[in-house]
């Protein structure tokens, strides 16, 4: 959108002396222009030009009218004419730059906009456009307001944080929320750019009695403006910021690669300038950009650098030749450590030096760590090499798919980093710590013996171990929580699994984790996360979310990583989505696909679910229902549906079996099952390969070979202690009965008053790899190729089978294909999950 100064001619008077009537006509032209009345605007500018032919102002106005009409070439000529009359007309240079930009003359356009800024430093539209084009504005930032006294808004004191207030230094326990900002349909770097979104989020976060927001990376200027406004208006409920500096992994584990390291250094300096409101950041792929003019530095609690560094990358760096083992910096030092310890200390020190030298400011700093790289030793864990050797020695076959990164091989130890005497703010340890991963948290008998006020807790035992190691230094749990996903990716002894929780269960577990972090004596916790983010992947589902770049367009309830939000993001319009046990009108609004005198099948789809409703038909108390589902008509599948005493003319890859309210599940044709399932007589390591290599949608069968939707969540392991730990998994196809109002994971419900059997199936259960383009799994080809194909639509057959004598009481053959519309922008709505209120009440009680 083109935004012009309120009074261009008043800002940049033309050289020509024109009659008052010409100036009045120009003013009228701009008023008409801003109201969208282009023809009257053009007429007024033309009248002014006739009264004063040599003036630049009327030509500039007409040029902008032409630009808005899409006539960039004519506009360019008018702007050139205006500048010939007055070369100091900043509006003329701005218009010329915009016209040339639309004509594809980017270099000349940038030159014109830089001329604009040189003439009028505060011409923000020109600055913003230059930054949007990824160009340097040419402006040097104003001198930094460097206080003569050191500015230390926060510091570490023993094992806690303190913040400076009007009353002096006060203890500060972190009650935080991690703010990811990728809305449905957006890539992770496509942040909201409007102030109102961030203002609304910050108000909600503060209302939950949180006191801290953490960012992983630099967000757009709108976030910092919203944070500044919130804190200025709510001094007693101010939000502190933990600012991150993101980094991708370096190539081949070389953290000293000049290009990569230089980019990271520039990003650190950029982050410092951003929080002080003194940055002009040009657009770059994958990054926020813009004019950063909001100074929030007085409420930045700490820096946390980097990401969850992958063990394989740290391992590679530690084994590079001539790695440094010590570091003596101005604010941080390492007497003896690994090259990775030294490198991270150096980066932290460089950021501290930059903020001190430019702004005379210090605050606490840490790098991101997580359990796979903790400095503790875990006997139940083994490296890849160790495990394969232990398998051979114990008579077990090697694992052909042992891709798990070498947890507990290398370590990052914050206790090796020592603040120097010049460090006024301190240093701390920051961990992403969840209760369900890695396995050593849940297999260690010592952790299993731990007991918090909540009860037995491996997680609490692990937190106590972390605190013991970091005695005297704050430990911040910078990520924790469980998701409200239907799918489960890892099981945990106390039931705090990686997924498989409805929203009420999620709330109870997150409250428990929050309490245990405090009881363990840590410096605070930052819950993950503010928002459900659809673009994410977890290891169980990632290979079946294809194309990967389209995951953002649909909501996979089987993917735990997409469902951590306190603010839920849900498919469909608010108030219009069918829910088990909900308004029957919504279910009856779905179109009828097949029908008979006895029963009708209605079908619908949205970015989360396939909806099926049986309308009419025999009651479930006397009848079993089996629905055959064919996601790729013309392919393979089974003709014999389970428990149905007739063979279909069509083939099906899935069978929905509704026996009664306590026994319902989705089955998959064995040939099309992407995962290995337990088989009778198989050995303990039979599930090592994880995937069913050779699964295909094209293999036909009449054997009635159906599998459960079992998936291995915890693989078979052998530890350094030579103890073995059995594989574990879940049957994802078991359907949960009930009302969605009572359980967010309800899959189906019988509404006897309405005569409806209501079912919703998450797309991930049906081997749909991208519902937004109707793409389904075609086959899995060894060693690691997952092929997909576009489905023409789904077909369904319905059998109603009498309970007493197995006779088919009603039959709907597969006929019509259900081809739902594809989409490029998902329809969705949001609401706060119960965990929001649960944490609000807990945090408010402390």
Language-model regions: role of each:
Residues 34-35, 68-69, 102, 132-137:
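Register position in tetratricopeptide repeats
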Residues 146-232:
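Active-site-adjacent substrate/metal-binding segments within catalytic domains
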Residues 194-266, 348, 352-358, 452-453:
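Aromatic-lined substrate-binding rim segments of carbohydrate-active enzymes
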Residues 272-301, 307-496:
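Noncatalytic carbohydrate-binding groove/subsite architecture in carbohydrate-active enzymes
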Residues 490-495, 505, 516-523, 527-591, ...:
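Aromatic-rich peripheral "rim/lid" segments of glycoside hydrolase catalytic domains that contact
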Residues 592-717, 773-803:
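Surface-exposed, glycine/proline- and aromatic-rich loop segments on solvent-exposed faces
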């Amino acid at each position: 959108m083109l935004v012009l100064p309120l009074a261009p001619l008043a800002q940049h008077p033309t050289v020509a002396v024109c009659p008052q009537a010409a100036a009045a006509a120009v003013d009228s032209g701009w008023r008409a222009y801003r109201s969208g009345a282009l023809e009257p605007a053009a007429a007024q500018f033309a009248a002014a030009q006739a009264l004063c032919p040599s003036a630049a102002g009327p030509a500039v106005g007409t040029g902008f009218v032409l630009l808005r009409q899409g006539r960039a070439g004519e506009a360019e000529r008018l702007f050139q004419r205006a500048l010939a009359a007055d070369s100091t007309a900043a509006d003329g240079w701005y218009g010329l730059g915009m016209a040339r930009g639309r004509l594809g003359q980017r270099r000349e356009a940038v030159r014109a906009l830089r001329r604009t800024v040189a003439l009028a430093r505060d011409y923000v539209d020109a600055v913003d456009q230059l930054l949007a084009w990824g160009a340097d504005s040419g402006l040097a930032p104003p001198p930094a307001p460097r206080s003569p006294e050191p500015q230390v808004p926060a510091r570490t004191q023993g094992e806690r944080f303190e913040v400076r207030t009007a009353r002096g230094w006060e203890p500060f326990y972190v009650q935080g929320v991690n703010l990811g900002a990728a809305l449905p349909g957006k890539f992770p770097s496509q942040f909201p750019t409007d102030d109102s979104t961030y203002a609304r989020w910050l108000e909600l976060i503060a209302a939950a009695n949180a006191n801290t927001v953490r960012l992983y990376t630099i967000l757009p200027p709108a976030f910092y403006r919203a944070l500044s406004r919130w804190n200025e208006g709510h001094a007693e409920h101010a939000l502190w910021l933990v600012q991150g500096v993101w980094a991708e992994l370096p190539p081949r584990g070389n953290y000293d690669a000049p290009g990569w390291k230089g980019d990271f250094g520039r990003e650190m300096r950029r982050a410092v300038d951003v929080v002080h409101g003194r940055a002009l950041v040009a657009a770059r792929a994958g990054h926020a950009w813009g004019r950063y003019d909001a100074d929030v530095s007085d409420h930045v609690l700490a820096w946390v650098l980097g990401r969850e560094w992958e063990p394989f990358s740290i391992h590679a760096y530690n084994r590079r030749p001539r790695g440094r083992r010590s570091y003596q910096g101005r604010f941080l030092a390492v007497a003896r450590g690994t090259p990775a310890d030294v490198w991270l200390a150096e980066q932290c020190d460089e950021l501290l030096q930059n903020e001190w030298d430019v702004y005379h400011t210090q605050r606490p700093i840490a790098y991101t760590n997580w359990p796979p790289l903790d400095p503790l030793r875990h006997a139940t864990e083994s490296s890849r090499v160790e495990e394969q050797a232990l398998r051979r020695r114990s008579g077990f076959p090697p694992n052909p798919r042992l891709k798990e990164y070498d947890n507990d091989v290398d370590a990052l130890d914050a206790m090796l980093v020592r603040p120097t005497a010049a460090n006024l703010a301190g240093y701390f340890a920051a961990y992403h710590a969840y209760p369900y991963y890695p396995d050593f948290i849940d297999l260690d008998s010592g952790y299993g013996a731990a007991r918090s006020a909540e009860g037995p807790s491996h997680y609490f035992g692990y937190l106590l171990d972390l605190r013991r190691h970091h005695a005297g230094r704050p430990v911040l749990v910078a990520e924790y929580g469980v998701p409200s996903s239907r799918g489960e990716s890892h099981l945990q002894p106390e039931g705090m699994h990686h997924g498989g929780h409805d929203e009420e269960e999620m709330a109870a577990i997150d409250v428990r984790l929050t309490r245990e972090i405090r009881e363990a004596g840590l410096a605070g916790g930052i819950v993950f996360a503010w928002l459900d983010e659809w673009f994410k992947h977890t290891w169980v589902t990632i290979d079946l979310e294809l194309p990967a770049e389209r995951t953002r367009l649909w909501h996979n309830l089987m993917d735990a990583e997409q469902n951590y939000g306190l603010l839920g993001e849900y498919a469909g319009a608010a108030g219009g989505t069918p829910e088990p046990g909900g308004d029957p009108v919504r279910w009856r609004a779905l179109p009828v696909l097949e029908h008979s005198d006895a029963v009708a099948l209605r079908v619908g789809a949205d970015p989360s679910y396939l909806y099926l409703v049986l309308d009419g038909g025999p009651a479930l108390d006397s009848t079993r229902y089996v629905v055959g589902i064919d996601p790729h008509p013309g392919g393979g599948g089974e003709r014999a549906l389970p428990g149905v005493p007739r063979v279909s003319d069509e083939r099906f890859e899935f069978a929905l079996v509704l026996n009664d309210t306590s026994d319902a599940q989705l089955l998959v044709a064995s040939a099309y099952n992407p995962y290995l399932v337990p088989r009778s007589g198989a050995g303990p390591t039979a599930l090592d390969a994880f995937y069913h290599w050779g699964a295909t949608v094209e293999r036909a069968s009449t054997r009635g070979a159906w599998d459960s939707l079992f998936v291995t969540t915890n693989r078979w392991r052998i530890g350094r202690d030579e103890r073995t730990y059995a594989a574990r998994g879940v049957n994802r196809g078991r359907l949960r009965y009930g009302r969605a109002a009572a359980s967010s994971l309800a899959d189906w419900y019988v509404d006897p008053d309405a005569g409806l059997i209501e079912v919703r199936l998450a797309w991930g259960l049906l081997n749909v790899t991208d519902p937004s383009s109707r793409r389904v799994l075609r086959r899995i080809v060894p060693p690691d190729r997952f092929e997909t194909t576009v489905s023409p639509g789904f077909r369904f057959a319905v059998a109603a089978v009498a309970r007493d004598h197995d006779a088919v009481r009603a039959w709907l053959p597969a006929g019509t294909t259900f081809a739902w519309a594809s989409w490029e922008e998902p329809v969705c709505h949001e609401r706060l999950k119960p965990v929001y209120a649960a944490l609000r009440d807990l945090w408010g009680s402390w």
